[in-house]
Amino acid sequence: MNSNSRAKKEATGFTRGRDYTDIEGRALPRRGSPAQPISLLRIVCFRRESRFLFLVAATDWRQSRPGRILVGTASWSDPGFVERWYPKGIQPGERLAWYAQHFEMVEVNSTFYSVPDARMVDRWCKNTPDAFTFDVKLHQLLSRHSTPAKLLPPELQRHAETDAKGKVKLTPALEQALTEIFLRAMSILQGAGKLGVLLLQLSPAFSPRKHDLSELERLIEMLRDCQLAIEFRNRNWAIGEQLRSTIDFLRRHRAIFVNIDAPAAEHFTIMPSDLDEITNSQLAYLRLHGRNAEAYLRGKTVAARFNYDYADREIAEVAERSKRLAADAREVHVVFNNNNLDYAPRAATRLRAALGQYVARPPQTPELF
């Protein structure tokens, strides 16, 4: 640290590293911790009777500038992307690097089905720019989905208890072991500064009628060093009096509520789209599933369920909603999950344009890639 930066640190108590203190020397949250936003220090200097007096005011950054908006898609290897969006002839190992030329973040979907090995995660890091962000879905068993033993890491399969249908029972010991293995893989992203949030996408069967949010506290505690976003897939968590209890729970635990854009229907699996909740002012999350109610309810595959191409008018609505969230959050992640054909990457590109962000031009001769 040079003399100028050292003097700045001593004067303000603020550094650009991973550990911060406020003006009184108290520890502030580390980068990436699920906590309240770090305040910036506004230093006002004025002259009085030939003497300089310094007034140091802790000013919430939200009052002076909006948060950063990152736009991406839920996966980079969806079959529709390969067929319609990527350049023809591009190799599987080249797709992520090409994706990263167009977007600053991606939501990893494959981790829902299996824990990636260290070599795979290391390749993700090497194939993306330094500032790229990975939001990562937690394993489906941690998300309270019905899970066959074969989808567990090999070292856990033979020890897992199963029911009569061969589905794994989520015991405290298994939850801890699976979480530790998952976090070891994520430590590579974390060490590279590329880990965004861990996404807990709860099963629709996890309902307030049968379950209590306190059941998640053990997992939340194990993930305390990461930013955790929770997507409810049962709308009963987000309506009536239950909504306030849900939001209060997330705020107490500094977990991030996942806001949704979905069809205007009241089926229990469709979350309401009129919520813009920010439960951790470090980050707001918005996932877009499309607005095709019939496809959403009847689709037998992901491509069929999320078969929706956002119109320009709807993209403009999403842009305004993203800006509203950015007014009260340090960062906003907007993820298109309408993964049919190339709908998601095209919608994400159009949203970046609507937000005034840089849009990479598609290659003129994709056959050459």
Feature roles, as predicted:
Residues M1-S3, R18-T21, T59, F336-N339:
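Intrinsic-disorder/low-complexity regions
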Residues S3-A7, T12-D22, L28-R31, P37-S50:
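Short, low-complexity, charge-dense intrinsically disordered segments
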Residues A35-Q36, R62:
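Intrinsically disordered, low-complexity regions enriched in polar/acidic and amide residues
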Residues F54-F369:
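Residues lining hydrophobic/aromatic ligand-binding pockets adjacent to catalytic sites
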